[in-house]
């Protein structure tokens, strides 16, 4: 009992330490604002105060710039009907309202000087990207949480936003794709001539190399804690037999973990960074020798709320990796919560009897509970799945290549965890 209380206390302390500040840090905000100025998304203003609360009118103007609408502000003669919008924001407000991105506080009032809250701003961003609150993609009251869950924002925005918060969220949105496409916001801006590829490249936005902090902000929400149950009694008592890790590879809930993580389990749940828990529905692919599995996670959580999308990671495989390359591991060490660690690749093809494919040896720290997590390159792409370690080795951690998942047919109906357990039990009898 004491051990479980201590683990719970440690988890709470880690969570408290991980909670981001309510507003953008001044130094970071200035860097983001400078970058957006170079991209012509913010007006040049040496005296700008990024700590001041953002207004609804400012948000409308920045939203339209981010969409590339200011370059070609075609409103089809549309007038939103708001009588209180100042001249400098009128075209942007009409443009955004015409497309259903923003609305007023009444039929004739926009409240341009009203302070902007996180849910209102994230709802604007999401609509611009093709998500709809009207068709159930998100709820306005939950827009900021949804934006964080899908990786649009690097942290969950809360409360009244500052101009620095807007700069941060716009910067975060640059490498986010429009819904259902492979087109990023930045690539569309370049196509429209709002900014140039040379400017984006000079800012390090093309073929982006992330720092550990940037990867954590962007992709930690794509990983989850996997809780496993091996008996009906454990399921009934809601006491898991083990914890592991996993990560999403598609917005609709496809995810990867180790096979040994789900071995012998009859039920599994995935708990996200924000604390929401979703049940594992099916196993679409697994290989006991490679020690890898693809699972399908329900989009309805245990509170019976459904999400339209999850943040997810791209798979790139191991073809281009070399010893000495920096890597990052994300997972659930010791079951105490999602975390990131950094290291380098020591060997790209280490053979072990335990695995059917050569493993990647690296020095990014993992612990019990990290099995099934993602090993990332500096671009935030998955090269392997964290799997184990040498007990007596210093910084010798093992990861299995993700390449088989890239070649697998994931359109099959798959099996339940109980069916996988029965299939493997029958094989072992033979």
Name these PLM-found stretches.
Residues 2-32, 38-91, 98-161, 173-207:
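Feature responds to low-complexity, polar/acidic, surface-exposed segments characteristic
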Residues 226, 246, 253, 257, ...:
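Terminal peptide-recognition signature
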Residues 133, 311-357, 367-370, 387-397:
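Flexible, gly/ser-rich surface segments that form the specificity/activation loops bordering the active-site cleft
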Residues 231-232, 250-331, 335-338, 356, ...:
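Conserved active-site neighborhood of the chymotrypsin/trypsin-like protease fold
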Residues 166, 247, 366-386:
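Catalytic nucleophile loop of clan PA
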Residues 64-65, 126-127, 171, 260, ...:
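Short, surface-exposed secondary-structure boundary micro-motifs
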Residues 209-213, 228-258, 276-280, 314, ...:
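A conserved glycine-rich beta-strand in the N-terminal activation segment of trypsin-fold
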Residues 201-217, 265, 269, 299-312, ...:
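C-terminal cap/linker of serine protease catalytic domains
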């Amino acid at each position: 009992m004491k051990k479980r209380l201590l683990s719970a206390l440690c988890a709470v302390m880690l969570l408290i330490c991980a909670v981001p500040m309510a507003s953008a840090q001044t130094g970071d905000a200035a860097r983001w604002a400078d970058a957006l100025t170079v991209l012509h998304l913010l007006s040049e203003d040496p005296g700008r105060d990024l700590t001041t609360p953002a207004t609804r009118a400012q948000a409308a103007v920045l939203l339209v710039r981010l969409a590339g609408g200011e370059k070609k502000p075609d409103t089809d003669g549309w007038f939103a009907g708001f009588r209180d919008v100042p001249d400098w924001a009128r075209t942007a407000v009409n443009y955004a309202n015409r497309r259903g991105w923003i609305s007023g506080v009444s039929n004739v009032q926009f409240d341009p000087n009203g302070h902007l809250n996180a849910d209102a701003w994230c709802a604007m961003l999401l609509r611009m990207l093709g998500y709809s609150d009207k068709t159930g993609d998100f709820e306005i009251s939950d827009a900021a949480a949804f934006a964080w869950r899908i990786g649009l924002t690097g942290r969950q925005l809360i409360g009244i936003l500052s101009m620095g918060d807007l700069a941060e969220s716009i910067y975060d949105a640059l490498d986010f794709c429009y819904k259902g496409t492979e087109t990023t916001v930045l690539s569309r801006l370049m196509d429209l001539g709002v900014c140039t590829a040379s400017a984006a490249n000079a800012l390090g936005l093309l073929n982006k190399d992330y720092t550990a902090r940037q990867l954590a902000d962007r992709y930690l929400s794509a990983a989850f804690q996997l809780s496993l149950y091996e008996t009906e009694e454990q399921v009934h008592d809601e006491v898991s037999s083990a914890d592991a890790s996993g990560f999403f590879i598609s917005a609709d809930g496809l995810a990867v973990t180790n096979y040994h993580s789900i071995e012998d389990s009859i039920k599994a749940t995935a708990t996200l960074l924000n604390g929401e828990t979703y049940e594992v529905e099916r196993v679409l692919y697994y290989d006991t020798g490679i020690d890898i599995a693809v699972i399908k996670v329900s989009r309805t959580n245990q509170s019976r709320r459904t999400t339209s999308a999850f943040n997810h990671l791209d798979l790139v495989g191991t073809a281009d990796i070399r010893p000495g390359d920096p890597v990052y591991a994300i997972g659930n060490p010791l079951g105490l919560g999602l975390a990131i660690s950094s290291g380098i690749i020591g060997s790209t093809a280490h053979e072990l009897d335990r695995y059917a494919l050569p493993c990647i040896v690296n020095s990014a720290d993992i612990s019990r509970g990290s099995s099934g997590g993602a090993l990332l390159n500096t671009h935030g792409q998955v090269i392997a799945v964290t799997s184990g370690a040498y007990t007596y080795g210093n910084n010798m951690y093992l990861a299995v290549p993700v390449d088989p998942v890239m070649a697998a047919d994931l359109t099959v109906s798959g099996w339940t965890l109980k069916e996988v357990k029965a299939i493997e039990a029958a094989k072992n009898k033979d």
